Regions:
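C-terminal catalytic histidine-bearing segment of alpha/beta-hydrolase fold enzymes
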Residues: 393, 435-490
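Hydrolase active-site cap/lid region
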Residues: 350-397, 449
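Cap/lid segment of the alpha/beta-hydrolase catalytic domain
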Residues: 262-324, 376-388
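Alpha/beta-hydrolase fold nucleophile elbow
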Residues: 335-346
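Short beta-strand/loop motif that positions the catalytic acidic residue
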Residues: 414, 420-422
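Short beta-strand element of the alpha/beta-hydrolase
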Residues: 244-246, 252-262
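N-terminal cap/lid segment of alpha/beta-hydrolase-fold proteins
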Residues: 35, 39, 76, 205-250
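Acidic catalytic loop of the alpha/beta-hydrolase fold
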Residues: 424-429, 456
């Protein structure tokens, strides 16, 4: 992939929405230096950070709260930075994620000053994979908070947000740090349903009786040497939709399947064409039963809550089956090389990638995901903070149904090598769940832990290690190389 193409993708295609304005740089007020630079500790070791204030740090005191798996409070304390530094420490006594929330005791300044031009570079809100263009959960509220407001401004131009600070990407004055204790030993919080495989094998068998009835419609592209189409496929109870991009030249190409972030939106087909120009046969799959060019399609914004108390009615049942249907269609194409199928996506796109690799283990060759959602959905019942899709833990029917759509229960079926990047302070795709999912995969996998990152719609640039690793692996695979996951460094 050319440098210009990489820069274009990074600067344009990862932006969640054109409505999100460039964020104002925010100087770092507090710096947290972990005792272990990779944030990973053994059981019995002291987990800790040295905290130093920056030149613009407020003088008020900070309270810190240590939580196991961001759920169970273990210890609280106060930062005293009067000497120029302080520390936060706790001993990890079991396989777990440590989440530390740091907040000021005193009220934040009533009228915060604007940041100086020497602050950190502005981040972007966007995807963890090469194709995404949508908002992740809560991205809209984040954008509103960080891109300014037109309220009280008749001209309608956004006003700069007030500078409050913090490191979680929310500009709310709060900080968080995270660490992992023996993370490769984190196990399932809830047993896998005994009929899990029978349930999904039955659904796939039923879908196999439905004719594909593929409808392929050419669409324009401005990328030279590439042709594009829109597809619609009959699935079990719904239709799968998306875009296809391929090189114009006749040949057989490796397949790249792009799965989408949470939200309802029109797909951006330009990155599909860019990947096709690199030599991929690309299928970009809409998460919903709607035309990929349609920004809404009548899909409810709270689709993740639809049917969430019944595995037969869950919105994610049809979503996962549509994803599988795309592989059925791929097998009919004469321009596919007949062997390579790479799945990639971020957040809910990562969730779908893991699920599809588990549903169709003999068809998928590689899985590359960042901040994958949908893991450990019952975590709230067992001392682990659960994340998206945010199924209600106070509803036992919802918790029972969730297990059939949880990535941790698909992971044991996966045969392909998996690369997964995730943040240690992510509250949308909590890291304890991602570790749990990875630990269920029997084959090779490559964790890419990013110790200082929230979900990447909040702290996009911090997730660059995963974005960069994805690009490198794709460049290897499109040239016919073989991806071998790197082992976790101690």
């Amino acid at each position: 992939m050319t440098r210009s193409r990489i820069l274009f993708i990074c600067s344009v295609l990862f932006v969640c929405s054109s409505a999100i304005a460039q964020r104002v740089p925010i100087p770092q007020q507090l710096t947290f230096t972990p005792y272990h630079s990779n944030g990973i500790y053994k059981i019995g070791e002291t987990v800790g950070w040295t905290v130093t204030p920056g030149p613009d740090a407020p003088t008020y005191a900070y309270k810190w709260t240590v939580r196991r798996n961001n759920a169970v409070v273990l210890e609280e304390g106060k930062l005293d930075l009067s000497s120029g530094k302080d520390k936060i420490e706790i001993v990890g006594d079991q396989p777990e994620m440590i989440y530390v929330a740091i907040e000021p005791y005193a009220a934040l300044a009533a009228a915060p000053t604007a940041p100086s031009a020497s602050g950190t570079s502005a981040g972007q809100s966007g995807s963890a994979s090469p194709n995404q263009n949508s908002q992740t959960p809560d991205a809209a509220s984040t954008a509103a908070a960080q891109s300014g407001s037109t309220a009280g401004n008749p001209g309608g131009s956004p006003q700069p947000p007030q500078w409050i600070g913090g490191n979680t990407g929310r500009n709310n004055g709060l900080y968080a740090v995270g660490a992992a204790v023996a993370p490769t030993e984190i196990r399932l919080s809830t047993p896998r349903p005994v009929d899990f495989d029978a349930f999904w094998d039955g659904k796939l068998a039923l879908q196999a009786t439905v004719p594909l009835d593929a409808v392929i419609t050419p669409v324009p592209t401005d990328v030279p040497g590439v042709e594009m189409s829109m597809f619609a496929l009959d699935a079990l109870g719904s239709k799968a939709h998306g875009y296809i991009a391929r090189p114009v030249a006749e040949g057989k190409y490796p397949a790249l399947i792009l799965l989408q972030y949470a939200g309802v939106y029109a797909l951006n087909k330009h990155p599909d064409a860019e990947h096709a120009a690199d030599g991929w046969l690309v299928l970009n799959v809409d998460s919903h039963d709607k035309l990929p060019s349609d920004p809404s399609g009548g899909i409810p914004a709270n689709y993740n809550a639809v049917g969430n108390t019944d595995r037969e009615k869950s919105y994610f049942l049809d979503m996962y089956l549509r994803d599988s249907r795309v592989l059925d269609y791929l097998a009919t194409r004469q321009d596919w090389d007949g062997k390579t199928v790479v799945l990639t996506g971020g957040s809910m796109g990562g969730q779908q990638s893991i699920v599809l690799a588990g549903l169709r283990p003999d068809k998928v060759t590689d899985v590359l995901v960042c901040v994958p959602a949908g893991a450990d959905t019952n975590g709230d019942l067992h001392g682990r903070k659960a994340g998206y899709p945010y199924w209600p833990s106070d509803n036992q029917d919802a918790m029972n149904a969730a297990l059939y759509f949880d990535t941790v229960n698909f992971a044991s079926r996966i045969k392909a090598p998996v690369m997964a990047g995730f943040g240690f302070i992510d509250t949308v795709s909590p890291p304890a769940g991602v570790w749990t999912m990875l630990n269920q995969i029997p084959g090779p996998k490559e964790p890419v832990p990013v110790i200082d990152s929230e979900h990447d719609n909040y702290t996009y640039m911090k997730m660059e290690p995963c974005h960069a690793r994805t690009r490198d692996i794709l460049d290897l695979l499109v040239k016919g190389g073989v991806y071998t996951p790197k082992e976790l460094q101690p």
